[in-house]
A protein has these predicted regions:
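N-terminal helix-turn-helix DNA-binding module of bacterial transcription factors
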Residues: 1-53, 57
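Amphipathic helical "hinge" segments at domain boundaries
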Residues: 49-106, 110
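Short, solvent-exposed amphipathic alpha-helices that sit
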Residues: 74-89, 170-174, 198-218, 232, ...
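Short beta-strand elements at the ligand-binding edges of bilobed clamshell
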Residues: 100, 154-177, 191-194, 288-300
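Hydrophobic alpha-helical
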Residues: 123-139, 207, 225-282
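Flexible loop/hinge segments that line or gate small-molecule binding clefts
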Residues: 129-169, 279-287
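Hydrophobic alpha-helical segments within soluble ligand-binding/sensing domains
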Residues: 162-186, 233-234, 282, 298-315
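Hinge/cleft segment of the Venus flytrap/periplasmic-binding protein
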Residues: 195, 199, 211, 298-337
Length: 337
């Protein structure tokens, strides 16, 4: 594990200078501070847990967690990562309170308010992309309650950090895969979760920008929202295929993959299909040859790392070295699944 001493030696500065930068104190030039932060990131530096334990035992932090609903099994995996880290942090006096909500503005605001009433000291949030959520985040931060977003982000808020995918990159990757599979010419249907979830819309943005710039013969026939619901996804995919007989490729930008694939199987058609995530039903369809490729984004790591960042800040007062903490994508096909 990297130490302050290691960072100091590589940066050519004193340990005290490194300590000031990592704890967000003044007295260091911007150029030196940036160099130290880059080295700390490259070494995957984490604050000393023994020191954090002593501080944590005095504070007894309570952290609120708001994730999207159980309709989307991907968030079960994010939650598993959060809960595994929560069990580890219980020894440091940390308690967690979790709420799972639908893609609904009022439901998410209500969940946050419930957690505030419980006296939370920090919030881990998969945000619904709406100005009211941005305002709520800013309200919490102004009250001294730090917020870390996980899996999906929200622009313009005072949230401290984000942990999750680079969704523009994910969309570009999907575009590249579809181009390889179709030789750059196809009629494409898109099923997404919700335009009010930033990660879904950013994936589509990354895909469409790449298609327009590099693969103009791939034409998007229609974009439909299934709200991460398998039954809705089944019905929408049936509708999409019936109304667009020339579609021979599909992109699922969010959940509802299994329902959509069942509709495709019943249609007797065999389009190229690119999806996201490695939930069990998606892997089943991948191994069966229905799905051509799926893009993984390490959900458990997202959950674990985001809670760890919040804990470290609450305990040491040091903000994360990086504001945006991206996990790596990996591509799964039938042969490596």
């Amino acid at each position: 594990m990297a130490r302050i001493k290691d960072i100091a030696e590589l940066a050519g500065v004193s340990r005290g200078t490194v300590d000031r930068v990592l704890n967000n104190r003044s007295g260091v030039s911007p150029q030196t501070a940036e160099k130290i932060k880059e080295i700390a990131k490259a070494l995957d530096y984490r604050p000393n847990k023994a020191g954090l334990a002593l501080a944590a035992q005095k504070k007894k932090n309570k952290i609120g967690i708001v994730l999207f609903s159980r309709k989307n099994p991907f968030f079960d995996e994010v939650s598993e990562g959060v809960q595994a880290k929560a069990r580890e942090l219980a020894d440091y006096g940390v308690t967690t309170l979790t709420r799972r909500v639908e893609f609904d503005l009022a439901a998410q605001l209500a969940a946050i308010d419930e957690l505030l009433d419980e006296g939370i000291h920090g919030l881990l949030l998969a945000p619904y992309n709406h100005p009211a959520i941005q305002e709520k985040i800013d309200e919490l931060v102004d009250r001294g309650i730090p917020v870390v977003t996980v899996n999906t982000d929200i622009f313009g808020s005072k949230r401290m950090a984000y942990v999750g995918s680079d969704y523009i990159c994910g969309g570009r990757t999907a575009a590249g895969l579809l181009a390889l599979m179709t030789e750059g010419e196809t009629e494409l249907g898109i099923i997404t979760g919700s335009r009010n979830v930033l990660c879904h819309s950013e994936r589509i943005r990354g895909l469409t920008e790449t298609l327009e710039a590099s693969y103009p013969r791939i034409h998007i026939a229609e974009i439909l929202e299934n709200h991460d619901d398998e039954f809705e996804s089944y019905a929408l995919t049936r509708q999409l295929l019936r109304q667009n007989p020339h579609i021979d490729a599909l992109f699922f930008a969010a959940a509802g993959v299994f329902g959509g694939c069942k509709a495709i199987q019943e249609s007797g058609r065999h389009p190229k299909i690119v999806t996201f995530d490695e939930v069990p039903t998606t892997l089943d369809m991948l191994r069966a040859g229905v799905i051509s490729a799926t893009i993984s984004q390490q959900p458990r790591k997202q959950g674990s790392r985001s809670l760890d960042l919040l804990f470290e800040y609450l305990t040491s007062g040091a903000p994360p070295v990086q504001e945006k903490n991206f996990v790596e994508h990996s591509i799964k096909i039938r042969e490596n699944s």
